[in-house]
Design a protein with these regions (language model features):
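C-terminal segments of large proteins
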Residues: 1-783
Length: 783
């Protein structure tokens, strides 16, 4: 009885049927002054998720049944299945996160499941009106749900629902592939079904198809009048070819009964995308070597790639080597797409070391506007701190949240180094986070090293802790003794430089000088690598003042490591950190040289003069001209091209190999398939001479094929495969690659007739993007 007093008698009044593309008018009556909110969702989606119309009163008063106040929480800690069923829907989405970067940037406009919700409406007289726009593509039943609550102070609530059927007079079903590449020729069709009551056996239907700029008609008629009997359907076939107009290609279809003034429209899109993925290439060379001399004081430099204009970047910079290197590395780190803890930290390190160096930022061209640099810096540093916090557990920091591995010891030390570096450069550090990580490093340093790699990590951690102001004399002595007993030639290892800096901070100058090596030997560690070792060596030399090598020698060593094919994001970040320490006034000046585009670009481009760097950004430029009267000594050029290549896929192998096969149901290699056939796509990759623990393979599907989910919806089984993701037009494998070939496969179905160019399959080391391979080329015919 008490519940009955608090129940609002909500009523939903709506038409039982509505046409696609029209508006459904709904009136909600709550019986008294109330706040009302309306929802309308595709009934098929609600049945799929088992969603029940909300019952607010039952939820609000369930704990007051029988006048008993419940204070136990066990049913919330371990809720029953019945309690959860219908309360928590099956969630999706998440594509705005890092993984969303693997989506097709030229994706078509899809037809999302129908869902509508209103803002809460104040119904002063107890009634509220709503207008629900129905998409032109929607056909089926929708559930209209209303929830209402009384004014504050008197608890009363209620809900109601109604079903409405959406059905058109004519049903249009375009049949098109999801994606195509420029040059693909394929068949399309428009199916028109006549559901107009009383139209008869001889109903005449006028159909018009409007093609977008990116599609050109090869055969067929786009405007026809068809005889479509009531309850029957007819097909309009046509053949089109995709042009070099990238992006969403909407095909619009209009149909109406002859003589009617109420046409039905339907739009379906396909994606026209290039055959290859976005690729960035860059070269850095002395101006005298990179450019071809022309007239006196004039040089020409060619840009080798022909790119589509979408997101294209072609930029040439002329600058002293050190300035150019820091700008280039900062730009390169900003462009990396993976969001693991290490890469987030590496991306932020240059911003930390430049934070309190306004004069150097002016030389680099990063001084103006100041607010822009601060915004970029805060974004990068904030992301790094968030990544550390998300991956931190008990003071240890993992590469990915929840993924423990042999690299965890290094990542924890690297995170501690980053947080201490923030403090050294005057940035606020989260005390609780830093405290737990540094405490874990203290525990790690106190343990006996398990092997050479572990000993290096402990020496690195001790160096980080000492910079935080902790007394690490005993730790340095213990780790040094371990190396003396267990390692050969360790005096030229990076740990010697760490020991030297540690002893120098302890005012043990003689011991520091003895320990600092005159040169640095490399390591095979993928994390504390040769590139990071060189950067630490340069940093410790500058900090101790022990002039074992000149700045020019250190600079050359850092540039070799940072711009080598095997450079990791750690190498690039640490090299930038060391180069900032080395940066000083350069004699060479670039502002006496003018850069212009000599061929290829539609415009003259954008000239950039920032600090000691002179650059020209001219997308589409194929040849640059550099003119000036000054000396070229000490000046370098940096050419960056980023974008999507025109033409067929360029096969390449840079320290990695990848291949792809299409197999029929008998396991035979095929280049043709019939409509409806199931095809197995097999992608194989290897890395000669080494193991890559974190590789990503992206296989783009040709138009005419669509990926098929495994029966159990799971991941295809394969050695080394750690993660598999499926997109509309591509699949992504995250795997460990070895010298022995490893193969991964998935199923695809032939869904559209035509001749389709084969897009790229690309493999790369996630942390050394220069180690990569691309395969593709050829054509697939679907009959």
């Amino acid at each position: 009885a008490a519940i009955e007093k608090r129940a609002l008698r909500v009523q939903v009044n709506a038409a039982e049927s509505v046409l696609p593309g029209q508006t459904l008018e709904v009136k909600v009556n709550a019986g008294q002054k109330a706040r009302v909110q309306l929802f309308a969702v595709d009934e098929g989606v609600l049945q799929l998720t088992g969603y029940r119309t909300p019952d607010p009163l039952s939820d609000l008063l369930s704990n007051r049944a029988l006048d008993v106040t419940t204070r136990q929480a066990m049913d919330l800690l371990m809720p029953t299945h019945e309690r959860l069923l219908g309360r928590i829907p099956h969630f999706g989405g998440g594509m705005d996160a890092e993984g969303g970067r693997f989506l097709n940037p030229f994706r078509r406009k899809s037809e999302p499941p129908f869902a509508y919700w209103s803002d809460p409406v104040q119904a002063a007289d107890g009634t509220a009106s709503f207008s629900i726009p129905v998409p032109e593509y929607f056909s089926g039943k929708m559930r209209v749900m209303a929830v209402a609550s009384s004014e504050q102070g008197s608890l009363a609530a209620g809900s109601a629902q109604s079903l409405a059927t959406v059905r058109g007079t004519l049903i249009i079903k375009p049949q098109l592939p999801l994606v195509a590449a420029p040059g693909d020729e394929f068949d399309g069709a428009i199916v028109v079904a006549n559901t107009v009551k009383g139209s008869g056996e001889n109903a005449q239907v006028e159909v018009a198809v409007q093609l977008p700029e990116g599609l050109e008609l090869v055969s067929g008629k786009l405007a026809q009048t068809l005889r479509v009997a009531e309850g029957k359907e007819a097909v309009i076939p046509f053949t089109v070819i995709a042009k070099e107009v990238l992006g969403d290609a909407p095909v619009r279809v209009t149909a109406k009964i002859a003589g009617s003034d109420k046409p039905v429209t339907r739009t379906q899109s396909l994606s026209i995308r290039p055959l290859g993925a976005m690729r960035r290439t860059e070269t850095a060379q002395p101006l005298a070597l990179a450019a071809v001399p022309q007239a006196k004081g004039s040089y020409a430099l060619d840009a080798p790639r022909s790119l589509y204009p979408y997101q294209a970047r072609t930029e040439l910079a002329v600058s002293p080597a050190r300035v150019l290197a820091i700008r280039s590395l900062l730009d390169k780190l900003d462009s990396y797409q993976y969001g693991c803890t290490e890469q987030s930290i590496s991306r932020a390190i240059p911003y930390v070391v430049l934070w309190d160096a306004p004069e150097l930022r002016d030389k680099l061209g990063l001084g103006e506007p100041k607010a822009r640099f601060a915004e970029r810096a805060k974004e990068a540093i904030g992301r790094a701190v968030s990544a550390i916090r998300a991956s931190s557990s008990g003071g240890s920091v993992t590469l990915w949240p929840g993924r423990w591995g042999s690299e965890t010891a290094f990542v924890t030390a690297y995170a501690g180094d980053f947080l201490v570096l923030m403090h050294e450069h005057g940035l606020a550090v989260p005390e609780g986070l830093a405290g737990s990580i540094l405490q874990e490093l203290e525990h790690a340093v106190a343990r006996t090293p398990a092997n050479l790699v572990d000993a290096r990590y402990k020496a690195y951690a001790a160096w980080v802790l000492q910079r935080d102001g902790r007394i690490m004399t005993g730790a340095f002595n213990t780790i040094e003794s371990w190396f003396q007993r267990n390692a050969r030639n360790w005096e030229k290892d990076v740990v010697s430089a760490l020991f030297a800096d540690g002893f120098s901070r302890l005012r043990l100058s003689k011991r520091a000088s003895e320990r600092m090596p005159a040169s640095m030997q490399g390591t095979t560690d993928p994390y504390l690598s040769s590139g990071m070792a060189r950067a630490i060596y340069a940093l410790t030399l500058k900090q101790t003042g022990l002039a074992k090598q000149s700045d020019e020698q250190l600079q050359a060593s850092l540039l070799d490591a940072a711009f080598s094919q095997n450079a990791t994001t750690i190498d690039e970040a640490m090299a930038t950190r060391a180069l900032v320490e080395l940066a000083q006034a350069d004699a060479a000046r670039a502002d006496s040289f003018a850069i212009s585009c000599a061929a290829g670009a539609d415009s003259s481009g954008i000239a950039i003069r920032e600090g000691m760097m002179n650059a020209l950004s001219a997308p589409g430029c194929t040849r640059f001209a550099v003119k000036g009267e000054g000396s070229t000594d000490g000046l370098w050029t940096h050419l960056v091209q980023q974008g999507y290549d025109r033409g067929p896929v360029t096969v390449s192998s840079n320290g990695m190999e990848v291949s792809r096969k299409y197999l029929n149901t008998q396991g035979q290699l095929v280049q043709n398939a019939r409509l409806g056939d199931m095809v197995t796509v097999q992608v194989c990759a290897r890395v000669p001479g080494e193991t890559v623990p974190n590789a990503v393979i992206t296989d783009m599907l040709p138009g005419g094929l669509e990926a098929v989910l495994e029966k159990d919806g799971g991941v295809p089984a394969a050695d080394g495969l750690s993660r598999f993701e499926r997109r509309e037009d591509r699949v992504i494998f995250f795997a460990e690659l070895k010298p022995e070939e490893r193969c991964f496969s998935y199923k695809a179905r032939a869904t559209s007739r035509g001749t389709f160019s084969l897009p790229a399959v690309q493999a790369e080391d996630m942390y050394r993007p220069a180690v990569n391979a691309t395969a593709g080329a050829g054509r697939l015919q679907v009959k």
